[in-house]
Amino acid sequence: MIFVEKSFTHIEADRARMVDISEKNNVLRMARAAGEIVLSAETMEKIRTGTVEKGNVFATARVAAVLAVKKTPETIPMCHQIPITGIDVDLEIGKDSVSAVVEVRTVGKTGVEMEALTGVSVALLTVWDMVKSAEKDETGNYPHTLIRNIRVLEKLKG
């Protein structure tokens, strides 16, 4: 097996820095990310029937995902502020989990995978927040609630 040493573009002499993208061309870019939250059967039924105390779980999670995408550079230090030209948020209810897919588009100098990942993460955290009273056990903990499989599904450039 041959190992190729890779260098990190955001680290120079052990100092983190934002990469200069001034010379890059503006091109159409897209990233799609996904993840899921595992919930109890009782909570899943409340989501299905629209009886969650805090309100519409999916509507709230969609808005939260959009806001998170737009705020990504405020929470990820080396992420560039780029114009977001489109955001799609899809939430689906499964047997024991809710899945989220966030697609982000831009015409810019750098990709939008961090924005898509941030959108998915915040959508799932918002679902958790909306249903946490139903998910808590008698000690106030969440023994079965689990966010998992957050990943980039696709990234396109050009």
From Swiss-Prot:
Q: Give the reactions, separated by semicolons, that this protein catalyses.
A: (8S)-3',8-cyclo-7,8-dihydroguanosine 5'-triphosphate = cyclic pyranopterin phosphate + diphosphate
Output the Gene3D superfamilies linked to this UniProt entry. Answer: Molybdopterin cofactor biosynthesis C (MoaC) domain (3.30.70.640)
Its pathway is: Cofactor biosynthesis; molybdopterin biosynthesis
Gene Ontology MF terms: cyclic pyranopterin monophosphate synthase activity
Q: What is its EC number?
A: 4.6.1.17
Taxonomically, the superkingdom here is: Archaea
- What keywords tag this UniProt record? Lyase, Molybdenum cofactor biosynthesis
Cysteine pairings via disulfide bonds = none
Can you tell me which residues form the catalytic site?
129
The residues listed in the UniProt record as binding substrate, with positions renumbered to this chain, are: 78-80, 114-115
A GO BP term, please?
Mo-molybdopterin cofactor biosynthetic process
Protein's UniProt keywords contain Methyltransferase: no
**Broadest EC class assigned to this enzyme:** lyase
Q: What is the purpose of this protein? A: Catalyzes the conversion of (8S)-3',8-cyclo-7,8-dihydroguanosine 5'-triphosphate to cyclic pyranopterin monophosphate (cPMP).
* Subunit architecture: Homohexamer; trimer of dimers.
HAMAP family hit by this protein: MoaC_A
The family this protein is said to belong to = Belongs to the MoaC family.
This chain's protein is named: Probable cyclic pyranopterin monophosphate synthase
Q: Which gene encodes it?
A: moaC
